[in-house]
Amino acid sequence: MPKRKDIQKIMVIGSGPIVIGQAAEFDYAGTQACLSLKEEGYSVVLVNSNPATIMTDKEIADRVYIEPITLEFVARILRKERPDALLPTLGGQTGLNMAMELSKSGLLEELGVELLGTKLSAIDQAEDRDLFKQLMEELGQPIPESEIVNTVDEALEFAAGIGYPVIVRPAFTLGGTGGGICSNEGELQEIAENGLKISPVTQCLIERSIAGFKEIEYEVMRDGADNALVVCNMENFDPVGIHTGDSIVFAPSQTISDYEYQMLRDASLKIIRALKIEGGCNVQLALDPNSFKYYVIEVNPRVSRSSALASKATGYPIAKLAAKIAVGLTLDEIINPVTGSTYAMFEPALDYVVAKIPRFPFDKFEHGERRLGTQMKATGEVMAIGRNIEESLLKACRSLEVGVDHNELPALSQVSDDELMRKIVKVQDDRLFYISEAIRRGYSPDEIAELTKIDVFFLDKLLHIYEIEQELASHIGDSYVLKKAKQNGFADTKIATLWDMTAQQVRRIRQDQKIMPVYKMVDTCAAEFESATPYFYSTYGFENESVKSSKESVLVLGSGPIRIGQGVEFDYATVHSVKAIQAAGYEAIIMNSNPETVSTDFSVSDKLYFEPLTFEDVMNVIDLEQPKGVIVQFGGQTAINLAEPLSKAGVKILGTQVADLDRAEDRDLFEQALKELDIPQPPGQTATNEEEAIEAARKIGFPVLVRPSYVLGGRAMEIVENEADLRSYMRTAVKASPDHPVLVDSYIVGDECEVDAISDGRQVLIPGIMEHIERAGVHSGDSMAAYPPQTLSQKVKDTIADYTKRLALGLNCIGMMNIQFVIKDEQVYVIEVNPRASRTVPFLSKVTDIPMAQVATRLILGETLAELDYEDGLHPESFMVHIKAPVFSFSKLAKVDSLLGPEMKSTGEVMGSDRTLEKALYKAFEASYLHLPNFGNVVFTIADDSKEEALQLAQRFANIGYGIWATKGTASYFENHGLHVRLVEKIGSDDDKDIPAYIRKGKIQAIINTVGTKRTADKHGQIIRSSAIEHGVPLFTALDTADAMLKVLESRSFTTEAI
């Protein structure tokens, strides 16, 4: 079937902010889809609330709306744009749920908008647990015994009948939210209650647990003419029972026989055909390791995290083709863009092994619950390609950026055998390292397989890695063993440790012995046809397939896996940098390890190397490509940390030089620079041990802000009020030493703002100043920010512009820099300078219409601002108000406190724009799912130091008709000041009348909870905060955010005053 001519305009719904379970893979899918539809000549309208994405760039669609993905706003856009059709299957769960809502509201029918791709009935059949069960029974496909329940009692009754353990799966939720494995009645009671609340249709599936089966996934495609094929099949290293997003995954499957492969393939194709899915679909199956018995676990009728992985693992662009199928093209009409010669109807064949390892946020959340189950917890993932399992697994381990270069955590050698076994059985995010340690201690693969239900085949590979370690240790300098270790993915640094030499020495031995990697092409067809993709991975074998081009090239380092503090914003900057390199006439080469992102789409750059971002792996590419230089400004801290070792090895770093990067990051050098430039900063000192820290704090005066130097996203930062707290911080939070000093600064309570600037060494362009809504003390990544600034005087703005220019020129900055200021009594202080692109680049680029990363890249390559037609100084402000608001994933992370402070906790962001501050704030709150009704009850539980300020907020809430509830101390303060309050217990002896109980009953619409500076003592507050999050009740832990919400509520309510 040729493409449809009866539709011209298509609306695509994006997936909104990044949360755990729905990350950058949808930016990649949405970007591909929009471009794919434009390529076919359709007009595309895009709606997405997340500014940090490539897909919300003007050139991706014909009309781009950065608006909340809620019925209210999407309906307005539909009425305004009147598209012929809507494509919802590329926006993750958000897009699907929105399509469902629009359809149920009758709006699609009223406007005559057709749904493209998979039909709603099919989405319903796959997502609604009851309909799915019926369909599987009709097809004769086995599913675990299960029961659909709408009440907790029904759940308990069913479980009593089939026996524990059982799995709870709420309907229509994302990333296993609200689900879990229950091994007894108490656990089921709690999880089922929560799951029913979270499910938008109050429905859960309770099923017999098949934990311990092998988990196999098939990524399948089907078109409107019923052609269907398997793009990729993948096998989880971890058995069923751990969410696939949290599992280590290999592609293609490693341990199943051809018969099993065909059996599961047939089942997957049968299911996608029965559901009549048009586009991509992911089928998860459980296979009994001891027989040919299997079960269908679930089907995702949309592009998913697994399809991003499958696309990158095979080179087959699923989202791009899904969009073409949606407009009527068939697989036998679409040319496979990888080979450029075969059609898309070919099933990809792989002659390599791909390993994916999830990246977890527990380096940020030390108290988080690390146990893994059916609810996803990873924020991102890495992928590595090799010629064998050992190679791809070890490359993936060193891509994780958790301070390891091998499947080994040095600290585990101290762990007792009992503890080791406990960690292997009760699965945590770092189980791979515990299993590897057990093998080093002589436990056999069979013993471990018995405990973990992981296939012995994989454990044998871990044993093989250990055997090579032994061989290396006993054959120092032996080139045969060295070659074997390299072919199995060992890093130079690991070999160096075993040989007791430096990694440089190992590298030299390799060069002398000609043991160098070759680069192989990812071509979808195991080299059977000619292929046109410049997409490579390294391995130690024969025949190098990557040829250095005659054109001068520039290498851009990506930012690795998505984690808290280093999100998709850096990928955005990387992609823009590549565009600018190409526009300047150079060949652009990207190196990155993240399968979810746009930067690792092989059509973005001239060459893509899918490799770990380590010194060794980067140097190997540089040796081959001999680029003009390397750009490290856009890859976050990952890339910046490589600047010094690369520069020492004689590599040219383009843009700001290493010595100047050091001046911004090293405390003493930075203070020196500020003195020379005559710029004030909060008084501070560095300390290399506990006593020095105490002495510094006495001199400066409490409160102080303490943090280690050289970190991203505010890791291990705290505001400390007294000596006892400071001592405990120095003992527990950081390991201070002369090499790694701790910074002790005076903590100034003032307004915070930040600036991104672009400099060519002579002139400095400041696109705009962003003013934070929360005062200093909340990490900039977790603050709401307004552009243009709403409360700064002209004098302060001029000072900020002046200091920014002095800093950029004084630090010899070429390209980008980000500066954070705090303002108190009209006095401006510099808090910190980051000599690189920051996480605000996408937001500021969108609201000022300056493609900042592109401009910075052109300057890095030697052009000037004047040549690019940009003025020196502060860019004129826009007349619209734009708000950037953070989005958190606390509901996925048990035991992580949602209290905001100097350590970053948000996973994503949204933007709200309008003509007034109140309207922009309203949109930002709606987009970040903080919805407050016009009236209801608000609970105040406030620390002593902010009761006075909270009183004014409470009075404003009362004026618009809210009921004011408060806990004991706060209530008596409010009553003494003439405000009528209902007293409520924090955590009561009668657990039917305390705050968590009222939250459960839906009696509380918002909670405002601040904590004194001694944060640790607040156990009750933590329980209240987590119950608010579990039940989706808006929670404000900073009074400034509550004030912003009040502005919105006040602007929406009429004034009713007696005369």
From Swiss-Prot:
Binding site for Mn(2+) 4: E832, N834
Domain of life the protein comes from: Bacteria
Catalysis performed (reactions): hydrogencarbonate + L-glutamine + 2 ATP + H2O = carbamoyl phosphate + L-glutamate + 2 ADP + phosphate + 2 H(+)
Residue numbers binding Mn(2+) 3: Q820, E832
Role noted for this protein: Large subunit of the glutamine-dependent carbamoyl phosphate synthetase (CPSase). CPSase catalyzes the formation of carbamoyl phosphate from the ammonia moiety of glutamine, carbonate, and phosphate donated by ATP, constituting the first step of 2 biosynthetic pathways, one leading to arginine and/or urea and the other to pyrimidine nucleotides.
Free-text note on domains in this protein's UniProt record: The large subunit is composed of 2 ATP-grasp domains that are involved in binding the 2 ATP molecules needed for carbamoyl phosphate synthesis. The N-terminal ATP-grasp domain (referred to as the carboxyphosphate synthetic component) catalyzes the ATP-dependent phosphorylation of hydrogencarbonate to carboxyphosphate and the subsequent nucleophilic attack by ammonia to form a carbamate intermediate.
Name listed for the protein in its UniProt record: Carbamoyl phosphate synthase large chain
Naturally occurring in which organism (per UniProt): Streptococcus gordonii (strain Challis / ATCC 35105 / BCRC 15272 / CH1 / DL1 / V288)
Gene: carB
